[in-house]
Amino acid sequence: MASFPELSERAQQLLKALVERYIGEGQPVGSRVLARDAGLSPATIRNVMADLEELGLITSPHTSAGRLPTVSGYRLFVDSLLTVKPLHQAIVDQLWLDLESRENPRDLLETASKLLSELTHMACIISMPRRETLVFQHIEFLPLSDNRVLAILVTSDQEIHNKIIHTPHKFSAAELQTAANFFNAVCGGKDMVSAREHLRAELAKERDRLSEQLLQAGEIAEQALAEGGRSRKPFLVRGETNLMDFVELADVDRLRGLFEAFRQKESIVGLLDRCLESPGVKIIIGEESGFRPLEPCSLVTASYSVDNRVMGVLGVIGPTRMKYERVIPLVDVTAKLVGAALNQRTLAPT
């Protein structure tokens, strides 16, 4: 963030008033309006606004004599001038009731994204739990007909991954149970990537003393681990159509670019990964995203964690003139509640 040590208290207060009025009304703010609100002369206001414009904190659109904040102006406002109040406890309690009642992690995240988009009237984006952070819990095998085995893999988010695997010969239920016991002992408590690598190394090391059936079952387990560690759709987006309600985003070409951005997984995933790098709420404003379709937008995110391990990130996408004082606590609290609800499931007895 740029530093503005030379900014007087009066200039800061006028910038704050200008940003708040622009966020509320969506129209460039004139000096007469600010003068009336601040009880100062229009000439004094114009002088201060000239200084703010010279510093790149506000700008004047061609069609108006009023001013509106730049990305730098929003950044100074969000980082230094904004007062964020806690959410009403009734909202927090209702969010928890809605999230805690979900039966599985996917439903929980779906519900969180829906609630957040409804509460903010903007688009909500949630990255799914990162597969490499998930922990292997256990694996089971069931013999099927025609030399097929059903591998059932359970991970720490309580997701169940099923894969039918064709085998070179028919396994008995007892052989498969022995194999499952061995693999659970070898892989238990390890993340998905480490579990697969450790299993492969253990099978290679013990190859001479393990039965051919167990070695073949090891190949089945490796396939199941690979399937369980493979990413599904990396994120959820809900409430995209809410963005059509904002005048500055309602241009057809701009909306097309935004909706296309939601389909370009690589760019969005890269942006969400950036948001995972620091704890707490992270705010990306306009061109700070480095992603052209999102330049007219701000992204407010917070990571959610399970057992002190960051699993993903959730956030709100809306116009740069969003009501940050409301969006920030909603995102922050929702992320904490999602983590708490997921943690409750992870720690629950199976």
From Swiss-Prot:
Any one GO molecular-function label of the UniProt entry: DNA binding
A single GO BP: negative regulation of DNA-templated transcription
Keywords: Repressor, Stress response, Transcription, Transcription regulation
Source organism, top-level taxon: Bacteria
Family to which this protein belongs: Belongs to the HrcA family.
Function: Negative regulator of class I heat shock genes (grpE-dnaK-dnaJ and groELS operons). Prevents heat-shock induction of these operons.
Matches recorded under HAMAP family: HrcA (MF_00081)
Protein name: Heat-inducible transcription repressor HrcA
Taxon lineage: Bacteria, Pseudomonadati, Pseudomonadota, Gammaproteobacteria, Methylococcales
